[in-house]
């Protein structure tokens, strides 16, 4: 955790919170779904974005050397075999610069024929990113029937729903295009996982898959309500 806090100390999420919260929450979601988690899988979840986010040029030389030393100590404690496995996991979870998102997820799934651990970590990553898209103090879907509201907005003159009432929101808004891009990523991941991963996989896999699907659907409904109200 000390390495992560140092690595992400200068970075923030798009909605404002410290960036280090994301890998910690993603790891927590993964661990919550699993019955037992080994050291390599836990470190994979915590470090899943490190190769993409952390580069020497972003730190002063002394700080980078200290971070390297900290990381080497962690790897040494794992032993050669587990160190190699962790490295391979992180490489597989890192999108290459010239890859499309579709190609990236396809490559990831090609390395998961014998185990769904990496897929589950990726699902936990996407779940946290999806939940992080909205930090409104009140959910616009709270206490309403989505399809009833859509029908009434479209066909009932001067309709005003409970969700149209002003309510407290945060001062930071996630750009609409970025919101749709996050949902696109979820759609690609879920569709490819559905096609390539054995649907009889364990309870932890199914719970994470269902959680990402549910969170994506809820966010898509919120987005559609917002768009229809602009008509």
What are these regions (language model features)?
Residues 1-231:
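Active-site helical microenvironments for divalent-metal-assisted chemistry
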